[in-house]
From Swiss-Prot:
GO biological process, one term: CMP-keto-3-deoxy-D-manno-octulosonic acid biosynthetic process
Source organism: Chlamydia felis (strain Fe/C-56) (Chlamydophila felis)
Gene behind this protein: kdsB
Range of residues in the leader sequence: none
E.C. numbers: 2.7.7.38
Name this protein carries in UniProt: 3-deoxy-manno-octulosonate cytidylyltransferase
Amino acid sequence: MEEQVFASKKVGVLPARWGSVRFTGKPLANILGKSLIQRTYENISQSTTLDKVVVATDNQRIMDHVLDFGGDCVMTSPECANGTERTAEAISRYFPEAEIIVNIQGDEPCLQHTVVDTLVRKLEESPEIQVVTPAAKTTDSHEILTNQKVKCVFDKNGKALYFSRSPIPHILKKETPIYLHIGVYAFRRNALFSYIESTPTSLSQAEDLEQLRILEHGGSIHICVVEAKSPSVDYPEDINKVEKYLTCHSSASF
C-alpha cells in the first residue's frame, strides 16, 4: 500500500513513542479526562502559522488513539534514537514539500500554540536563522538546581552559547537572569537533515542534550525569549502537577 504524502509547507510534528524508560505508555496517560498526547495536539492545532500538525509514532496503540480523537498520525521506525530523528523520518517520508518543521515534544500538554507561532515567525522574518528554540526566565530555585530542567545562555543577539543541566551562568549577583530552555525546535528543512547526518558529539552525550550536537558541529541556534512557562510530563508523578496547573489556568485554551 502506497504511503500518503502531504503538500504542507509548515509542519508541526509531535514525536510520541510507547517505550519510554521513565514512563512507559506516557502519550496515553490520562490528564483530567484527555490523554497527554491529545492535550498537546489540540493546543498546537490552534497555531495560526502551521499548515499541518501530526503525531509521529512507532506504536499502533498511539496511532489508533490519535485517529480516534480526530488527529493526524504517521507511523515511523522503532529504531529512531530520539524525537528529532523521528521528526526527520516523518518529514522525509510524508512531507516532501515541508520547508519549516517544528519539533514539539509530546510531553508538553500545557504548551501554548503562541510559542510555536513565535518560532515560525522568527524563521519567516530572519532568513539567516536555521534553528530557533524558546526559553523563559525563571527565579525558581528548584528549576535552577535540578538536572531535569535545562538551562541556556545566549549572546546579546539571541545566539545560543550553551545548554546545560547544571545552573548556568554561575550566579555571583542575585540579579543575574536564568533562562530555562523549552524543548521545542523550529528547523529549516536543510538544518533538520544536517543534524540527522551529523555525528554524535562529546558534550551532547555528556549532558544528554541533542541540541549541543548542533553547536559542537559549528551550527547555531537562535533563542526566542517567551513569557509562557508550563510544566511538562517526565515521570508519572508529574501528572498531578500538570492537573493542578490546568485547573488553575482553566480560563486558558487548554
